[in-house]
Amino acid sequence: MLKIEEIKEILPHRYPFLLIDRVTEMDIEEKLFVKGYKNVSANEQFFQGHYPQEPIMPGVLQIEALAQAGAVAILSMEKFKGKTPLFAGTNKVRFKAKVVPGDRLDLYCEIVKLKGPIGIGKGIASVDGKTVCEAEILFAIG
């Protein structure tokens, strides 16, 4: 549905911190959610130090990828276009499996609460249909 160039028109993030490659499904009218993915390459900068002998995608970056998925939905809404998404916190974070080079990290983020410019998203990241990370993401739009 949205390729990387279209995502870059919505999000202010850029390499090496743009962590969503494609949006495959999005609804900003009813349920307010995004499905997308990040192809996790062996060439990612973070693998140089985390960990060179057994590369694992840092959990905080998995959460950031989920937050960026949610931000695509929010910033696609007319009233928030061109604004900056801000992290406000996380709750109920769980990591269930490793994400390694060659994985496709599937992202799902649904905005479950939105009051003015502040809200909560529920994110689930998975690899091959298995949940690897889930989190409640608190955000503000600046």
Curated annotation (Swiss-Prot):
Class of the enzyme per the UniProt entry, highest EC level: lyase
Highest taxon in the source lineage: Bacteria
Active site: 50
GO molecular function ontology, one term from the record: (3R)-hydroxyacyl-[acyl-carrier-protein] dehydratase activity
GO cellular component, one term: membrane
Disulfide bonds: none
Subcellular location: Cytoplasm
UniProt keyword Lyase, yes or no: yes
Signal sequence bounds: none
Keyword hit for Kinase: no
CDD domains: FabZ (cd01288)
Gene Ontology biological process terms in this record: fatty acid biosynthetic process; lipid A biosynthetic process
Keywords from the named record: Cytoplasm, Lipid A biosynthesis, Lipid biosynthesis, Lipid metabolism, Lyase
EC number: 4.2.1.59
Major subcellular location class: cytoplasm
The reaction(s) this protein catalyses: a (3R)-hydroxyacyl-[ACP] = a (2E)-enoyl-[ACP] + H2O
Family: Belongs to the thioester dehydratase family. FabZ subfamily.
Role description: Involved in unsaturated fatty acids biosynthesis. Catalyzes the dehydration of short chain beta-hydroxyacyl-ACPs and long chain saturated and unsaturated beta-hydroxyacyl-ACPs.
Name of the protein in question: 3-hydroxyacyl-[acyl-carrier-protein] dehydratase FabZ
Gene name of this polypeptide: fabZ
